[in-house]
Design a protein with these regions (language model features):
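A conserved ligand/cofactor-binding region detector
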Residues: 1-314
Length: 314
């Protein structure tokens, strides 16, 4: 077990301090008037308020790990069944009692606010729940760790019953955004697919193969802080969203090829659309394979980048 992270918070987490923090989030982050704010507005404001406490500890944790050049555990999984983070964040940040009272003194009901949270569409069953539990446990044990997965737009599916039959609908859990994630565009990575290998030798006769005619994709990372319980340690889960290398074909658009202009964008973003796409077709099998290759390739690049930042060689 590593030594716990020690730091002195700059935030006032008393009841009055949290009330001020919530009201500031409502005003400055959401631009909402308290008199007309909806339950969802207040849920977002209170979520962002507790996230401030968590992020302060996240930054202290990552600074400690970086300065100590610690070894990290990396956990890669196609799914993470995170559950709802609202109340869990209150407990992990050690502010549940004060936050509950602050919410009550603002004339709000905690049960009404917690009902506004959507489950993250990042996991399906046992494998995803196990992965999420591992991340929670690692943070609680003060172990340096980072999770890696895919930033699914729709997750698995939303189930409805019509006339006695199951109907599968897209689960757009990101419809209204989420206060728990932090986009990290500065750590975007590029990966390549398909293409062919050219057998090439240099002047000394060394074999130096070239990978050519590839399709390029961009992996955009989104971080979700993972606070430990009863400790200041906060690790994070990094999720990759797939984007086209070239979003828009302006030449095709100008000649009237409107579908062609966004074809690469649509094809590339399909990779992070849905958890476990139907693999009964050849295209479905290919998509599943590409999903796994995509997030592993992105994650390995990120791991190597982080290692080389603190180490000159292997």
């Amino acid at each position: 077990m590593h030594a716990p992270v020690e730091f002195h918070s700059t935030l006032d987490t008393s009841v009055e301090g949290l009330k001020t923090l919530i009201q500031n989030q409502l005003k400055f982050s959401l631009a909402r008037d308290p008199r007309t704010a909806s339950a969802r507005d207040w849920w977002l404001a209170t979520s962002k308020a507790v996230q401030c406490v968590v992020i302060e500890r996240l930054m202290a944790t990552q600074t400690k790990h970086r300065d100590g050049n610690v070894k990290r555990l990396y956990y890669l999984s196609l799914e993470f069944l995170m559950g709802r983070l609202y109340i869990n964040s209150f407990h992990s940040a050690g502010v549940y009692g004060n936050m509950e009272q602050a919410i009550r003194e603002l004339g709000l009901n905690l049960d009404d606010l917690r009902a506004e949270e959507y489950d993250m569409g990042l996991g399906n069953g046992g494998l995803g729940r196990l992965a999420a539990c591992f991340l929670d446990s690692l943070a609680t044990l003060d172990l340096p760790a980072i999770g890696y997965g895919i930033h699914y737009q729709y997750g698995l599916f939303k189930q409805e019953f019509r006339n006695g039959y199951q109907v599968e609908l897209p689960d757009d859990w990101m419809k209204y955004g989420t206060p728990w994630e932090i986009v990290r565009p500065e750590h975007t990575v590029e990966i390549e697919l398909y293409g062919q290998v050219e057998n090439v030798f240099d002047n000394l006769g060394n074999y130096v193969p070239r990978w050519t005619d590839t399709k390029k994709l961009m992996g955009i990372p989104y971080d979700i802080p993972i606070p430990g319980y009863g400790t200041n340690t906060v690790n994070f889960l990094r999720l990759w969203s797939s984007k086209a290398h070239e979003d828009f074909n302006f030449e095709a658009f100008n000649r009237g090829g409107y579908d062609e202009a966004v074809r690469d964008k649509n094809a590339s973003e399909t990779i992070s659309k849905v958890l476990y796409p139907n693999d009964k077709t050849e295209s479905g099998k290919e998509l599943r394979l590409i999903q796994q290759y995509f997030f592993v390739a992105c994650s390995l690049q990120d791991i190597i980048r982080r290692f080389l930042r603190s180490n000159k060689d292997w």
